[in-house]
Amino acid sequence: MLDFMDYIQLAFAEATSWNRDNSYSSLTATAQSLLDFSTPERLRVHISSLATPHFATSYTLGTVGLIDGSVSYLYSTVPLDNTPSRSALIPLRKLARGYRQVQPPVAPVEDWGWNSLLDGLGSFQSTHAGDGNTHVSLSQKATLLHATLHLPPPTTLNALFLRRISPTMQLSLAVCSTRGPPLSKSAPQASLLGQLCHDTGKYSNEYLFSTDNSLFGWRGLWNFGPDPRHPRDPSSPPVSLLSAGAEAYYSPVSSLIGMSTGLRFSTLPAATETPSSTTTTTPISTFPYTLTLILTPLTGSLSTTYSLRASPNLAFSSRFGFNVYSWESEMVAGCELWRRRRKPQHQQDDPADHDGLEWARRKMRMHDPDYAPPTAPAPAPVAAESDEGNESVLKIRVDQSWNVRLLWEGRVKELLVSAGVGLGPSSFSPSSWSVPASGSAQAGGGGGHAKSYWHGVGVSVSYSS
């Protein structure tokens, strides 16, 4: 489950119309959400609050052998008035990341005052004067400041500076500083990561620099198909999207070189929408699904993923990896199952409309020549009702060594709860394409892996206001 501060950062991206899907780093986001999820460690409590539309705080207390915790603060120049902050009102699908429906590329928003050098006070005064234009208050460069202090010693400080410098460009600076031992007189270890993103909708480029080993990097993504900046026929939206990307890294200090390339094919929401009129003859084509292919030439690694959303409440994903140099392979499969809140008896409609199989009935009716597609209702209320009806989700992940992870995430009264467990005959695969195993999975002496069937169990409880 996402932390509250990560949720606020996603709300900031939505408020500033930044498409996080149009990035090479998000190429395998769907498969990672279903296969590479992590389970809580022991007991952890989160208390958060969006005190004002511009300011948020979060406090964390955990027990992982020792008592530890963190304090986080966040400030945004963009007001987040429409962002639900109470844990009882936040849509669960916003926090429990599952199957990620890729959205079609969109053109950058051009109607903001991006050329202002300062967060102009006059813009806010004109709004209070009563002109009623909500975009006037946003006539500034959207900026986000975030800092987290991890305790106890050795304390670690993580800070983030995020700024939209133009409709197509975004700058982020991330700092990580760790204080040394109490008796050490050396300066704290610190590193800076700078990232400049350029997104035009048709393609995106990311330029990175890290002070750790003076690492330079580049990531790029290209979307095949029409350019969203020059729309042609808005009445026929695209039903699929093919994207190709690559990344490269180089460190002149350590003489390290890294690179990878990948493809992603995904269906878009228009592929499974209900026809809106009787003149529409396009049937429901398929389930929503996403295919990816990642190739790392220097290490000889090849990874493919296939994710499928079989129904609104059920999704599957699988991944196969192979290394041509070592002949090692990896196979991982996972799924998620959502449980919806049961409606009161007086609000229940036809049960056939809410069993998650309406897509199959529509698909069968499409083959009837006498069938006329009904007029589709407004999509916004349906989406809101779907978010409010989600009560919990169960995720399962298993690999070729029969290592199993179980994760349950749901709402209990006013609290958001995550509970997970890891089981298996051995530690998780140490291959380059899998998630590193936790420390509890590596327990045991000798030169080999410990044959432990219990990798750990944990519970995380969150409350926000």
Swiss-Prot record:
<dbReference type="GO" id="GO:0070096">
    <property type="term" value="P:mitochondrial outer membrane translocase complex assembly"/>
</dbReference>
<dbReference type="GO" id="GO:1990456">
    <property type="term" value="P:mitochondrion-endoplasmic reticulum membrane tethering"/>
</dbReference>
<comment type="function">
    <text>Component of the ERMES/MDM complex, which serves as a molecular tether to connect the endoplasmic reticulum and mitochondria. Components of this complex are involved in the control of mitochondrial shape and protein biogenesis and may function in phospholipid exchange. mdm10 is involved in the late assembly steps of the general translocase of the mitochondrial outer membrane (TOM complex). Functions in the tom40-specific route of the assembly of outer membrane beta-barrel proteins, including the association of tom40 with the receptor tom22 and small TOM proteins.</text>
</comment>
<protein>
    <recommendedName>
        <fullName>Mitochondrial distribution and morphology protein 10</fullName>
    </recommendedName>
</protein>
<keyword id="KW-1134">Transmembrane beta strand</keyword>
<dbReference type="GO" id="GO:0045040">
    <property type="term" value="P:protein insertion into mitochondrial outer membrane"/>
</dbReference>
<keyword id="KW-0472">Membrane</keyword>
<dbReference type="GO" id="GO:0000002">
    <property type="term" value="P:mitochondrial genome maintenance"/>
</dbReference>
<comment type="subunit">
    <text>Component of the ER-mitochondria encounter structure (ERMES) or MDM complex, composed of mmm1, mdm10, mdm12 and mdm34. Associates with the mitochondrial outer membrane sorting assembly machinery SAM(core) complex.</text>
</comment>
<dbReference type="InterPro" id="IPR027539">
    <property type="entry name" value="Mdm10"/>
</dbReference>
<dbReference type="GO" id="GO:0032865">
    <property type="term" value="C:ERMES complex"/>
</dbReference>
<dbReference type="GO" id="GO:0051654">
    <property type="term" value="P:establishment of mitochondrion localization"/>
</dbReference>
<keyword id="KW-0812">Transmembrane</keyword>
<comment type="similarity">
    <text>Belongs to the MDM10 family.</text>
</comment>
<dbReference type="Pfam" id="PF12519">
    <property type="entry name" value="MDM10"/>
</dbReference>
<keyword id="KW-1000">Mitochondrion outer membrane</keyword>
<dbReference type="GO" id="GO:0001401">
    <property type="term" value="C:SAM complex"/>
</dbReference>
<keyword id="KW-0496">Mitochondrion</keyword>
<dbReference type="GO" id="GO:0015914">
    <property type="term" value="P:phospholipid transport"/>
</dbReference>
